[in-house]
Amino acid sequence: MTMEAWDILVIGDGPAALRSAAVSAKNGAKTLLISSKALGDGGTAALEGLAAPIHEMNNRGHREDTIKSGYFLCDQDIVTTKTNMAIDEMNHLEKAGVVFSRDAKGLPMTKKGIGHSSSRIVDAGDASVRDVQQVLEEQCMKNGVVRRGDQLPIMLVSTKQKVDGVITLDMINGRFVAIQTKAVILADGGFEGIFNGTDIGYGMDLALQSGIPLRDMEFISKTPFGVTDSKLTLSSNMLGYGANLCDTSGNSISADNLVELCEAISQSSGAVIDGREMGDDKVWWQSAFR
């Protein structure tokens, strides 16, 4: 077993992990980021782009839509904080290099997403995941973050409710590594990947083993745009660009929120995305429509 010492250890390699690591290193912390998968596989966290009320006076509408779509079960303080930060996060990504789709005035183009009463979804078409991942990786490199892939977190080491470090398995070299650290950031996503063999929530497992209680485990993230018999997920933002969702008979499928849309699709004979009416906006989805 080898031993190392770092100021901050970040577990994960998606947008949340990369952003946390970059900011930590920028503020002077010696930062290590590890992922149980190969580096660059940030998952689909950025698939739907970002909801930012850039054409609204405040975040009130965004906040209310989020709470309503969550059937009033969301932590409303967290919703308020997140919707307040949305525009700043969009500005950060844009300044860092994400090329959002633009309108005729040259501003980020906003589309109306499922569950939103106003147009506030900004994205880069089917390049959203790639662009966000690439830009945040560049921020990590710029600030000196050390990143390692294929590192399986085994155990969180703590003493009297104080984190001391993490034991990991280096799957490249086949050895255990003891990492001493002042703080651990768990940002490797949830456990929803257990249904298709992708992300299974190693960070949540570490927390649970250490006696940290997990909240809201009954809420499971779900998308109605998964492709049958594959791990491919399409973005619902295509509907905002003019695509139509139909069943196999050509009848339109619609709903007020994602939960109802999932139910409508499951009750149909099958779902088809028709992109023939997208016009010039189809250029943003060249990978989805070939």
Where are each of the predicted segments found?
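Glycine-rich active-site loop/strand segments that organize a redox cofactor
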Residues: 52-82
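Glycine-rich loop(s) and the adjacent beta-strand/alpha-helix scaffold that form part
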Residues: 183-232
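Conserved redox-cofactor binding core of oxidoreductases
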Residues: 92-175, 180, 187, 226-238, ...
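A short alpha-helix-loop-beta-strand transition element characteristic
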Residues: 44-45, 73-80, 90-107, 213-216, ...
